[in-house]
């Protein structure tokens, strides 16, 4: 741990809450941002509220793992049903696609009008990221649309499973993908690296932990 606070900005793949908690306890003050090349970099920030400082560290990490709210330069940010373009409910559970609008969003893909038309269908830039909207207006990513696992007609977030796996005290690394299944169409398949200190941890131990 450091003897002083180190300010860090994290982006790209959504960090598990356990990783954020470990970083904070080591003296890093984490700021979580989200964006794409098409939005000129970061366009969303998990703006911190002082009242959250009183939350337990684990709850602070859970709160900070959300992507957040729009930067001031962004005209609008919504989570919409990509088929109907209806807004999702702010209930932190209804899944939709994250969409952007504003002058920090690109005009289009170079010499690719078809891709540009598809990306801006309905007047919004489609990010390809799936997420939920919280009652306080903060968004949280759940998966890439191409990575979501559809099992028996249900959408399963690979990111949520990975986040659960990282909570296991003996898990060092985790990655979840879809595996073809004759009955369900797809089922989650996890690739896990255990810590060197792990003893006697089995596949069934990991499965039972996730179920609990």
Describe the residue ranges of each PLM region:
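AMP-binding/adenylate-forming catalytic core of the ANL superfamily
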Residues: 102, 107-108, 130-212
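Conserved AMP-binding/adenylate-forming
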Residues: 6-11, 15-33, 38-138, 145-148, ...
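Short, conserved loop/helix-junction motifs that constitute active-site signature segments
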Residues: 2-4
